[in-house]
Swiss-Prot record:
SUPFAM superfamilies: FMN-binding split barrel (SSF50475). Its EC number is 1.4.3.5. Catalyzes the oxidation of either pyridoxine 5'-phosphate (PNP) or pyridoxamine 5'-phosphate (PMP) into pyridoxal 5'-phosphate (PLP). It is an enzyme of class 1 (oxidoreductase). It catalyses: pyridoxamine 5'-phosphate + O2 + H2O = pyridoxal 5'-phosphate + H2O2 + NH4(+); pyridoxine 5'-phosphate + O2 = pyridoxal 5'-phosphate + H2O2. GO terms for molecular function: FMN binding; pyridoxamine phosphate oxidase activity. The gene is pdxH. The keyword Electron transport does not apply. Binds 1 FMN per subunit. Its cofactor is FMN. Belongs to the pyridoxamine 5'-phosphate oxidase family. Substrate binds at residues 9-12, 69, 126, 130, 134, 194-196. It comes from Pseudomonas fluorescens (strain Pf0-1). Pathway: Cofactor metabolism; pyridoxal 5'-phosphate salvage; pyridoxal 5'-phosphate from pyridoxamine 5'-phosphate: step 1/1; Cofactor metabolism; pyridoxal 5'-phosphate salvage; pyridoxal 5'-phosphate from pyridoxine 5'-phosphate: step 1/1. This is Pyridoxine/pyridoxamine 5'-phosphate oxidase.
Length: 215
């Protein structure tokens, strides 16, 4: 390693985030930041990529990267195999956290809350607009289970293709969406000297409380 990890750092130079810029609820600010990220971030960064953290039945945390596929006044939506590891975690502990990081904008958003399944109709609507290969893959892959090499997965895909030779695949019952209902949303804006801006929204009854956190 040519550079010590202790010496690896970058300076943050963009404008800060003030309470005057923060609306009464976090969704409007997320929409604004997300729109700016879509315009600004370039490959390999995907603006809707996020880290999803879940906790299993033994209290052990697990993280992975996946894509945000829906956002409305209720919450943040993603889709997956309900029988996957994350699906099993959410069945045992229906709380999760998301983190978005947009390096060009020097911004991060952390979201925490309860997770619920979306309706079968909503899952099917999204499933039908996915590429054919992805729709077949949702049937073929026993997600998170141990398999005997890549060949087994390719054999499963071939069998699935044959199954749906004469018909379009429909949404499997074991596949669909989850919606995270936010209880806490923190907006982080990088600032000089590591004195970052952190504005935190938290639910209190039917209202959102806005607070500034020390960096």
């Amino acid at each position: 390693m040519t550079q010590s990890l202790a010496d690896m750092r970058r300076d943050y130079t963009r404008d800060g985030l003030t309470e005057a810029q923060a609306p009464a609820e976090p969704f409007a600010l997320f929409h604004q930041w997300f729109a700016e990220a879509v315009k600004t971030e370039q490959a390999p960064v995907e603006a809707n990529a996020m880290t999803l953290a879940t906790v299993d039945a033994d209290g052990r945390p697990h993280c992975r990267i996946l894509l945000l596929k829906g956002l409305d006044e209720q919450g943040f939506t993603f889709f997956t195999n309900y029988e996957s590891a994350k699906g099993q975690h959410l069945a045992a502990n229906p709380f999760a956290a998301m983190t978005f990081f947009w390096p060009t904008l020097e911004r991060q958003v952390r979201i925490e809350g309860r997770v619920v399944k979306v309706t079968p109709e909503e899952s099917d609507a999204y499933y039908q607009v996915r590429p054919l290969g992805s729709r077949l893959g949702a049937w073929a892959s026993p997600q998170s289970r141990v398999i005997n090499g890549r060949g087994e997965l390719e054999d499963l895909l071939k069998a699935t293709e044959q199954r749906f030779t004469d018909t379009q695949p429909h949404c499997p019952e074991h596949w669909g969406g989850y919606r995270l209902l936010p209880e806490r949303v923190e907006f982080w804006q990088g600032r000089a000297s590591r004195l970052h801006d952190r504005l935190n929204y938290r639910v209190q009854g039917a209202d959102w409380i806005l607070e500034r956190l020390a960096p």
